[in-house]
């Protein structure tokens, strides 16, 4: 089966991420201590590993056998996230899903508890492409997640 080069060679563990030691250390420490925030914003120029770190983080917070804050890469959850069969980790491309209805759909999904994982993780790639109304809806969603009891196992 064909796989794009960036998918084939994308780092799968924090230790494989290059030139991001500070953020990798902070994320590992949060995972190891069990103090995971409800929202993270990764910024930087193209190709610096923002999406890669988000995907590794999604695996690490849900991994059944984490090792020093890294995902094991072998458990059912890690393999399921890698092959896309785990529905609790969702990657949304905001460049093509940039409307307020897309964010409202995301907000509605956060009301449900995770089905297979410890956390539901939403990775919004290219978030700067959201419309103004969609971004406002996202901010409202983040505030609801922060104060709402049923959605405390959600990370955006």
Give the ranges of each region predicted by the language model.
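Pre-Walker A (pre-P-loop) alpha-helix and adjacent loop at the N terminus of AAA/AAA+ ATPase modules
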Residues: 2-39, 43-45, 108-113
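Helical "lid/switch" subdomain of P-loop NTPase nucleotide-binding domains
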Residues: 23, 71, 85, 99-102, ...
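Single conserved hydrophobic/aromatic residue that forms the stacking wall/gate
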Residues: 145-156
